[in-house]
Amino acid sequence: MMKVVSPRTRSDSITEKVFRRVYSNFNISTVEDEYIHRQRSSDYEKESRLRKRGLEDKEEVMEMEQMGAERIKTVLILMSDTGGGHRASAEAIRDAFKIEFGDDYRIIIKDVWKEYTGWPLNDMERQYKFMVKHVGLWSVAFHGTSPKWIHKSYLSALAAYYAKEIEAGLMEYKPDIIISVHPLMQHIPLWVMKWQGLHKKVIFVTVITDLNTCHRTWFHHGVSRCYCPSKEVAKRALVDGLDDSQIRVFGLPVRPSFPRTILNKNELRKELEIDLNLPAVLLMGGGEGMGPVQKTALALGDSLYNSKESNPIGQLIVICGRNKVLASTLASHEWKIPVKVRGFETQMEKWMGACDCIITKAGPGTIAEALICGLPIILNDYIPGQEKGNVPYVVDNGAGVFTRSPKETAKIVADWFSNNKEELKKMSENALKLSQPEAVFDIVKDIHHLSQQQQRIPLFNEFSY
């Protein structure tokens, strides 16, 4: 229990200001009163309510507690659409819970910041999209906020100011378990939960969605678990003060359709109407179809055509995402090789399963999915900061190469498809070795184990608002 300190003649601490602000609507005169109010015996409160129903026997109280322990548990996943990877990881975790545990858990995915707070927290998506288009600005923001004293001061001020709103967001869903899949969703909710006395009552875990380089805001010593996608990230967690018992290295959570669906390449090609006999390269532009997609596609159109024999040596599939202008431009081009131009796709496991290699920027989710499919990877760009470390993660493990040049990219693919098929095969084997297809299932099973250990009726149910 938190020690109660009588008010002294001094300026209020941030914690006291937060409590005074949060509980001003409940006629609680002081922070001390609220601490005392929250420290009442939970057994006393349960029995008081049960007496009103005529259930005064302690055995019946224990029976009710056991029933509460077996009820459907609520999992709140905190995320933000700052890049597509956070939502994808959240949805992968949701789907894995459903596959493994059926209706035992109710999964809610929310951007609590966007729905309950004000600026700047509710505007992170727009700010992120602006900064990644100006990579120099993003690099300054990423590295400038990395020192602990800077981001802790900034986040603690936001936590104090928006404590009431964040509490309301958490209270609405009454979670038994909170999962953060975003670097800015550790410190603030954990501080607010601690100020409320909830940090020992609700399981809070972090699932890191960056493969190698990651921001220090991912790490908070107050979590029950920190799930790291690689040993490199786990080492950073230890350096930042987490205990070894809090850390698990399972890999990056990807959609269960990747590891759990057995896909035959020829059957997929028939379904997707792709040539069965030509090797295929998958060119990704991300959800927004960004990067040098058009230049790379045109270069591949030339390099994969054997002008001497007047026939193609490979075929191209381009995923343009939501970029309709790009899709229209490529679709209207006269190609000398088989080309499929697609928009936003929801079944990427099929397109990856039908191809022989992939060209993409260094997004962690796409890399993890490609590794599971055994695809050699050509990385053609990265966002400074969190994606930079993904390049050596792929290249140093022999699963791919890096080049920003569309012409060089096209040359590498043509070489793989003609004179250097052994290198393509070796990289495919290395990709499979590096993959962690069961990561999302290992994560949800471990969270379930934590939940079983903490059989309890959540403190959220002890208060009515």
Swiss-Prot record:
Gene induction: Induced by phosphate deprivation. Induced in rosette leaves when grown in acidic soil.
Keyword Plastid: yes
Tissue spec. comment: Expressed mainly in roots. Detected in flowers, leaves, stems, siliques and pollen tubes.
pH-activity dependence text: Optimum pH is 7.0.
Name of the top EC class for this enzyme: transferase
Organism domain of life: Eukaryota
UniProt-annotated location(s): Plastid, Chloroplast outer membrane
Reported regulation of activity: Inhibited by galvestine-1.
InterPro entries given in the database record: Diacylglyc_glucosyltr_N, Glyco_trans_28_C, Glycosyltransf_28_UgtP
Residues binding UDP, per UniProt: H86, R255, G365, T366, I367, A368, E369, E387
Assigned keywords, A-Z: Chloroplast, Glycosyltransferase, Membrane, Plastid, Plastid outer membrane, Transferase, Transit peptide
GO molecular function, one term: 1,2-diacylglycerol 3-beta-galactosyltransferase activity
GO biological process, one term: glycolipid biosynthetic process
Keyword Glycosyltransferase: yes
Job description of the protein: Involved in the synthesis of monogalactosyldiacylglycerol, the major structural component of photosynthetic membranes and in the chloroplast envelope biogenesis. Can use both prokaryotic (18:1/16:0) or eukaryotic (18:2/18:2) 1,2-diacylglycerol species, but operates with some preference for the eukaryotic one. Plays a minor role in galactolipid synthesis in chloroplasts. Is essential for membrane lipid remodeling in phosphate-starved roots. Acts as the major factor involved in digalactosyldiacylglycerol (DGDG) biosynthesis in phosphate-starved roots.
Further remark: Auxin activates expression during Pi starvation, whereas cytokinin represses it.
Family classification: Belongs to the glycosyltransferase 28 family.
Protein name: Monogalactosyldiacylglycerol synthase 3, chloroplastic
Organism the protein comes from: Arabidopsis thaliana (Mouse-ear cress)
